C-alpha cells in the first residue's frame, strides 16, 4: 500500500530536518542485505549517532533539495539506505566500515556515494571518510600539537639547569 500525501510530507520534513543537522551522508544499496543485517545496522547506528533510513528516492530528492547534500540528488538511484552522520563527519562511514569487517561476505561495492561538505564522493571513498577523527580525537591531536613545543622548552630549560648545576 502506498503512502498518502500527509505521510510523504512528514517523511520529507523529517529527512530534511535530519539532513540540515548532519555532517555527512553515506548511501548504500540494501539489495542483498538480510533483515538481520539491517537490524544490526539500525542498532549500531543508534549507538554511534547515525540516522539510518530507507526512503523512496523521490522523497529523498525533495528532502535534500535545500540542504548541503543537494549535489547528491542525481545519485539517488536504486534501492538505497541513507546514513546521516549526526555527531561527527566520519560516523556513518565508520558504521559501514565496521559492518563490512563483521560481514566479510558482503562487498563494499554496495556503498554508492558519500556526500560531505557539499561534495559527492564515489562509494569507494567511504574508507577515507571513515578515517576522519571524531571531535574528541581532533581536540586531542590539536592539544598534543600545542603541548609539544611547551614540553620541548621545559626539557631544554631543565637541561640548562642541570648543566649549570654540574659546572
Curated annotation (Swiss-Prot):
InterPro entries to which the protein is assigned, alphabetical: Ribosomal_uL10, Ribosomal_uL10-like_sf, Ribosomal_uL10_bac, Ribosomal_uL10_bac_type
The keyword Ligase appears for this protein: no
Signal peptide feature range: none
GO cellular component: ribonucleoprotein complex; ribosome
Keywords for the protein's UniProt record, in alphabetical order: Ribonucleoprotein, Ribosomal protein, RNA-binding, rRNA-binding
GO biological process, one term: translation
Membrane spanning residue stretches: none
Gene3D superfamilies per record: 3.30.70.1730, 6.10.250.2350
Gene Ontology molecular functions: large ribosomal subunit rRNA binding
PANTHER family for this protein: 39S RIBOSOMAL PROTEIN L10, MITOCHONDRIAL (PTHR11560)
HAMAP family assigned: Ribosomal_uL10
Family: Belongs to the universal ribosomal protein uL10 family.
Task of the protein: Forms part of the ribosomal stalk, playing a central role in the interaction of the ribosome with GTP-bound translation factors.
Subunit structure: Part of the ribosomal stalk of the 50S ribosomal subunit. The N-terminus interacts with L11 and the large rRNA to form the base of the stalk. The C-terminus forms an elongated spine to which L12 dimers bind in a sequential fashion forming a multimeric L10(L12)X complex.
Protein name, UniProt field: Large ribosomal subunit protein uL10
Organism: Dichelobacter nodosus (strain VCS1703A)
